[in-house]
């Protein structure tokens, strides 16, 4: 006789609409902020709108995930729902992969198609008419129109902070894996220790990246206004930094849950999802280190 799994269907929730409004307000505030900066408006409501949107998103995350945690610990979830969570997280990471595929694609297009074309490769017509003295080299320290887009004085060496950050993130992948094995074996002390070390490594990475950005802006002249090189550099490293920030927050929440006695060797998907996300962030950074800093 066939057995049927129960499938928990929650009541109607306010969290999806709060998530939608929060994300809209956040993006609108950020766009307003950037536009006002470009227009040199002394007073801008963009930062305030962005902050309000961020608060709404934070409220939604704590409330929605808190409800999911309570339902899970109450035994309302079935193996079928666990599979749904795993598929959902897998597709979410896949969508994030596509983001970075697009950004890396933009970098490769700029390096191998558009900028070489401006320097005279291919038809040469456009470059001879507008920028006859422009020569292609990457990293781009000589923009076609230096008056409009001043090029950076120099680029960031990969063998300083970027290499250190690579060591930190690769080490954090090792520590989160050790923590995961400790969870499976029921070694709570080792689990707490190695997960805390992972969180600290993530915080250290973010601190060094902030130092790198300050150095780039103040001393190297490498900014968002430094032409296409600055734009692609900050787009890729900044978007990745946002993911490291999110991942570090997630790992910290996992640590707080573990300190409260959550998770065991059978019920641990929240921790597994966090570790999947962290490994994804680490792999992306290796690609960034190679293609943005080294090559």
Task: Please name every model-derived segment.
Residues 1-295:
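...captures the hydrophobic TM-helix bundle architecture rather than a specific catalytic motif
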């Amino acid at each position: 006789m066939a057995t049927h799994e129960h499938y928990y269907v929650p009541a109607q929730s306010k969290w999806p609409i709060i998530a939608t409004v929060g994300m809209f307000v956040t993006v609108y505030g950020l766009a307003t902020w950037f536009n006002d900066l470009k227009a040199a408006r002394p007073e801008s409501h963009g930062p305030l709108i962005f902050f309000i949107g961020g608060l709404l998103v934070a409220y939604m995350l704590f409330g929605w995930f808190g409800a999911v945690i309570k339902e899970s610990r109450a035994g309302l979830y079935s193996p079928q729902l666990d599979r749904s969570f795993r598929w959902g997280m897998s597709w979410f990471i896949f969508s994030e992969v596509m983001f970075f595929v697009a950004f890396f694609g933009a970098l490769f297009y700029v390096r191998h198609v558009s900028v070489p074309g401006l320097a005279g490769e291919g038809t040469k017509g456009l470059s001879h008419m507008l920028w006859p003295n422009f020569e292609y080299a990457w990293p781009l320290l000589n923009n076609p129109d230096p008056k409009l887009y001043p090029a950076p004085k120099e680029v960031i060496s990969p063998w300083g902070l970027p290499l250190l950050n690579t060591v930190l993130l690769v080490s954090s992948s090792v520590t989160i894996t050790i923590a995961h094995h400790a969870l499976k074996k029921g070694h709570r002390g080792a689990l707490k220790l190695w997960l805390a070390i992972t969180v600290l490594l993530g915080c250290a990475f973010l601190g060094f990246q902030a130092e790198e950005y300050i150095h780039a802006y103040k001393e190297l002249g490498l900014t968002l206004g430094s032409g296409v090189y600055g734009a692609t550099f900050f787009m890729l490293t900044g978007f990745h930094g946002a993911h490291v920030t999110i991942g570090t927050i997630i790992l910290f929440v996992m640590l707080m849950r573990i300190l409260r006695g959550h998770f065991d060797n059978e019920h641990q998907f929240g921790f597994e999802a966090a570790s999947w996300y962290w490994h994804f962030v680490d792999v992306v950074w290796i690609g960034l280190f190679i293609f943005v800093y080294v090559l």
